[in-house]
Amino acid sequence: MGATLKQDILQCIGNTSLLPLRNIVPKNGSRILLKLESENPTGSMKDRMALAMIDAAEADGRLAPGGSVVEYTGGSTGVSLSFVCAVKGHPLHIVSSDAFAREKLDHMRILGATLQIVPSEGGGMTEKLTRDMIEAAGIVAGKTGAYWTDQMKNKDQMAAYHKMAEEIWKQTVGRIDGFVQSVGTAASLRGIGEGLRQDLWGLMNPGPWTLKKFWKEP
């Protein structure tokens, strides 16, 4: 059966492919599968969490039709929110900094977000800069009434990662022993891990130091 017709581009989020690693895995070694999150519209798994947060806020009235959204970010979360808000018709105010990659900031602007840049000290990220960005986002939300997604505290994103766990479970037909995820805030690792453990109690989340045994030596 061919690909189904999508009603809008947001339906292209998720249901990404699993790809087996072959050449770098020892013969008769473990089967290692990669989840190709680059297949999401902006090339990032953050599309999932951005859509989940906006959908939940719309559903319970925190975000009215055409209502504004604000968030502090400098990376893929900002790009994904810019994308989702553009499709859904929500003006987006991003609080960011010159400490982040210019390409990411330009991507957000191209997708229609308004950026407020908090100056860094020497171009580097510091705890103070993070606090300043959070404070600035809170001020914008307070003054304008915009919905603040507040990614560090927003539990709505867990629904996206639980759904991703369901995808993995179905794609592997339940044949999975461990799950590894590169993380920033670790929300994805927590959410996917929780989802998988609903079906497979005892699933391992091995630390990176344990992975060497899966690879061929150079």
Predicted regions, residues:
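PLP-dependent amino-acid enzyme catalytic core
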Residues: 1-218
